[in-house]
Amino acid sequence: EAYWGTQQRLLDLGFSFVYDKGLYDAVRYEKMADVHGQVAAALAYQKHLVRFLENHDEDRCADAFAPGRLASVATFMGTLPGMRFYQESEIEGAKIHLPVALRRVVEEPANPASVAIFEKILQATKQDIFHKGLWHLLPISSEGDDSSGNLIAYEWRLENAWKVIVVNLAGAAAQGRVSFADHPPAAQQARQYTFHDELDDARYPRSGDEIRRAGLFVRREAYQAHLFDVSSA
């Protein structure tokens, strides 16, 4: 457990993983500048962070985040590099905070909406790419307005597999253009890419020229996310 900015000190002492309390607070309270700063940290450091939406000290996820926010924050925390931590009964949407000294719990019915969201994320992140792949933060430029700062985009790559994640962590619609210029697509000569969203099964065909030249235009409503599996032809 790492609080009060002690993460690097504990890692220097030999701990393998430390809580990412800073990112949790930034996401919970929608401090987008802080979110951007946290995910821009060196990958060598981020690999040692524990990403969480609740633990035995914090409020239950179902209380801390309104139901409409769950899709974006769970996709975000569940697809970042580092350790992904899930508290007992978090997936089921439990709301009663459990003191660690208590040896019994109050039974709560599972929330089907919460279970459905987490099951999709857990199913997607079972794939090797989220454990053995290379992660990159992706730049997003403005497109038509100044809302792109509410979006976070990043990718995972492993051999020919390619995932692109875009999340809107704010309470208003946001749009922008995701650039792959710093990390060109592996299939650079592809005529077309298909972005298959593993959250809602939607498919978005895009020309290879557009992706290489201009990037990917995205628009997400408040607290929505994309978890793309990208294929090429």
Feature-to-residue mapping (PLM):
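Short, solvent-exposed helix-loop connector elements
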Residues: 59-66
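A cross-family glycoside hydrolase active-site/sugar-binding cleft signature
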Residues: 1, 52-53, 87
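Structural preference for long, well-ordered alpha-helical segments in enzyme cores
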Residues: 73-77
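Carbohydrate-interacting/catalytic domains
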Residues: 8-18, 30-44, 64, 80-86, ...
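A polyampholytic, Gly/Pro-enriched intrinsically disordered region
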Residues: 17-25
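Aromatic-lined carbohydrate-recognition surfaces of secreted/lumenal glycan-active proteins
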Residues: 1-7
